[in-house]
Each structure stands twice: as structure tokens, then as C-alpha cells.
Amino acid sequence: MLGAIIGDIAGSRFEFRNTFDYDFELFHKECDYTDDTVCTVAIADAILNGKSYESSLVEWCRKYPNPMGAYGGSFVRWIYNPVPYGSWGNGAAMRVSPVGLLFNNEETVRREAERTAKVSHSHPEGIKGAQVTALAIFYLRTMKSMKPVENILSTFYTKEELTAIPEKGEWCDNCQGCVPLSLMLLLQSTSFEDAIRRAVSYGGDSDTVGAIVGSLAEALYGIPEDFKEKALTYLPNDMKEVIHMFNQTIFTMTEERKRRFREADFAVTNPKTGKTRVIKASQDITNRKPIKKK
């Protein structure tokens, strides 16, 4: 989720005053977190602490009513009267990264992404934007390859839709434009930093495109440690606490997956004889003697 936050912070000062300079200063004194970060933290908090997505978004957005760049007009009304309003805005995609990072199968990622969107952005395109973004993050995280992004683009979007993405510098705040654009920008990237620079210097809704691309880039490349440290200096303590809890959860999940892999039985086939035997988890693969438990 910190990838989305970094993209948001880097793009914040250019949202209404675009830059096309690739070499812009990433962490400038004029930068700050925007509504994209507040909503991303809210989704993470909901997952980590068993809250509903609606209640967590309402809680965090009321707590931070005036972030840099402000909330959209319809979403402001939603904060104080949380009834879905059929939006297809890119807010559904910019806040969904915790879903793609925390859940571990496609079905759950799809379902939870839809749930995060439906509370406000209940238009089919809003839901689709959230699902596509979360699925891309999930597959980038698990496969560490660009191929899933290419497959997602061809599966969810027609050629006509892909040729209709926003031009450089064109304002676009809907999912059907911003999400495929973000996926394409990632495909052109070579590193986390390069992805952020490409996103922000493309212009348009620079903080939100930065947030979406940042969330994708985090899943594929990881984040440089100095970027993490700099980004955290812009955030209040309660947001840092959620991020810390999120990172600890990711670490625990990763270690658990490693443990399960070590403890799993698996089959080994002899290439000469073609015979297959099962290696038990409690067995040393090298000398095939039982491992003594301490």
C-alpha cells in the first residue's frame, strides 16, 4: 500500500498544475498526502481490524476532511450520507491496493475489490476498475512478471477502449481511462522509481495515476528503502501505525507461506527411470533420513 501512497505524494503538487518533466523532484516540500492516501489507509484498516469498508472510509475521511487536493464533490456528500451513488470515478481503483496485497487467491481478491468499490462507486465500471487493479497487483506480487498485466489488458478491455485512453496531459478521473492507462505505464517501466516518474509526468490526474501505478509497481519491483522513509515523513502517526501493522501482517504471511512450503510433501520424478516418489516434509531430501525434531 505504501507504493500507492508514494505515487500519491509525488503527484500531489501536480494534480492541477501538471509537469511533463520526467526528472521532477519526487519528494518536494510542496508535496503532501491527498484523499488517495486517506482512502487507501481506510481500506487497509478495515481489512486488518475487521471493520466494514464503509465505516472505515467514513471514519478516516471525517477525521481528515481537508487533505491536499480535496475529495470530489459527490464523495464529500457520501462521507456524511454514505449511500452508493453509482460512481465510475478512479477513486475505486486508487484505494484498493491493500486487497491485492493481503488476499491470496483470485476469487477473494475479486470479491473484496468489488466490496471496497460498491460502498460508494457502485457503477459497473467503478467496480471493474477496482477489480482489475487489485487482480493486477495480486498477480504482479505472486508472479513477478509483466505477463499478467498484458493478459489483464486483453481480457478486460477491447482494442477500442485501449486506444481511447487519455492523451498525455488530458484530465481523466474515471476508471475506464485511468486504469488501463496505469497498466500501460507500468508495462513501459523498468523500476519502481521509473514507474512513478512516468505516471506523474504523464500529466492529467497526476496524484491518482501516480497512486495506481505506484501500487502496481510496488507489487512488481518492491520499494526502495529510502523512498519508504521519505514518504512516512509526510504522514500523521495514526496512518503510520496502520502502515506498520500492514507491513507486519505481510511479513507474517510471507513467513507462513515459506513455512508451509518447507513442511509440504512433494513429488520427485527420477528422469532416468521415470518413477515418482513422494518426499515427506519430515525427511531430509539430501540423505533421505528423518529430520530429528529439537
Predicted regions mapped to residue ranges:
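Structured, active/binding-site neighborhoods that engage oxygen-rich ligands
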Residues: 1-294
